[in-house]
Amino acid sequence: MQKNDLVTVAIEDIGVGGEGIGKVDGYTLFIKDAIIGDVVEAKIVKAKKNYGYARLMNIVTPSENRVEKPACPMARRCGGCQIQEMKYGAQLAFKEGKVRGNLERIGEVPTELLDKVMQPIVGMEEPFHYRNKAQFPIGTDKEGHIITGFYAGRTHSIIPNTDCALGVAVNQKILEIILHFMENNHISAYDEEKHKGLVRHVLIRYGFKTDEIMVCLVMNGEKLPHAEKLVDKLCKIPGMTSITISVNKAKTNVIMGNEIKLLWGQTYITDYIGNVKYQISPLSFYQVNPVQTEKLYGLALDYADLNGNETVWDLYCGIGTISLFLAQKAKQVYGVEIVPQAIDDARNNAKINDITNAEFYVGKAEEVLPEYYREYQESHGGETAHADVIVVDPPRKGCEESLLQTIVDMQPEKVVYVSCDSATLARDVKFLRESGYELKKITPVDQFPNTVHVETVVGLQRKDI
């Protein structure tokens, strides 16, 4: 195969970035915007020895699972929705198969065991308009007009769009007010290459249970000229609760700055997951799909199977979202998180919910737990620290082996693993199964419909119980 070759390909799988995967005479091709079941004509744009990348030129025979009219006309250009052109039922089947395949292949979990413990994926009734948070870059088009939207896949080129199919409806109104304000008052948009211009991004957060709205303008400066004019328009939107600016003068592609200045209202909004209330600031980590998060955490609580006498460790606890869920049913919960701001939020969230049996530690889970285990042994005459249940919700890279070993050494009866990457989940499950734990329940949860991402909740139990 060579660059510019035109080939006909039957698509058999989806890659980690959402690309369709097919083979021509044993040669693997990755083709963006093609889905499983399509037969496509594609032009090779990059040819390696054993695989290549091709551009979709024509759909010869569409898959029976192809959506005739995608909900968002920008889907192919924008980097946000990789598989929006696939019917939702097929998306769920693909994600469930991906989790199962990784557990079989990487985790070496026997098929018979998976048949027994794996539950069907938990999907959404309405797989659009589910995101409670959106970050919109601000820039200019070729004519110099101020625009906002989303970055095209793997670029920092803005695709103009104020009406994202995954975001809430009020986003469009807010963005239009901000764009008009900037044009009318000659407020400049940030230019990433030149590091000039004022407004970099707009962050919008929405409380699904409270209808509270936050708007935060990320700025390459300390002050927004004519801010009162913008505030006057925005605060008339029903539910508007917080209008702030985030100062970010660094030459970086990190979106938020660390300094938040209040323009109007308060610096946070509130929302609920189940009956637990959370205060969410512009810098808070908070799950973006509250409908599915409630199901996800409900499963984690179910798998922990608490009776009120347990000591629970929640590793990578963020702002305490899972910890505070668990604290309602446990004797004591300890949460660990590396981000100090998140721990401040976690402690505050415990306080506003009158939860007194949750303590939080700042630090790397990989360091805090082994250190606690070691110090406990030293101060208790060699007696080992014990936890009844350990919950982990790590980033995509999964858990470090040293942390997994400490978990095993602490001999919890149950381990609940919440994963956003089924490949690293499978690797870690393999370690735990080889160290005396067995799979009891697995449920994938579609936290991000129309994308390739999938969350999974796994319950493991010590074999000698």
Predicted features and spans:
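Terminal RNA-binding accessory module
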Residues: 1-74, 359, 367
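Rossmann-like S-adenosyl-L-methionine
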Residues: 2-8, 16, 20, 222-237, ...
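Short, acidic/hydrophobic/Gly-rich beta-strand patch recurrent on exposed beta strands
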Residues: 20-25, 149-152, 216-218, 346
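Short beta-strand micro-motifs enriched in acidic
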Residues: 43-47, 137-141, 205-209, 463
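Extended interfacial segments that mediate partner engagement and assembly in macromolecular machines
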Residues: 57-70, 76-189, 224
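Short, solvent-exposed loop/turn elements at beta->coil junctions and helix N-caps
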Residues: 119-127, 192-193, 201, 205, ...
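A short, glycine/Asx- and small/polar-enriched loop/turn
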Residues: 128-132, 211, 452-453
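Carbohydrate-binding surface patches
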Residues: 203-207, 212-223
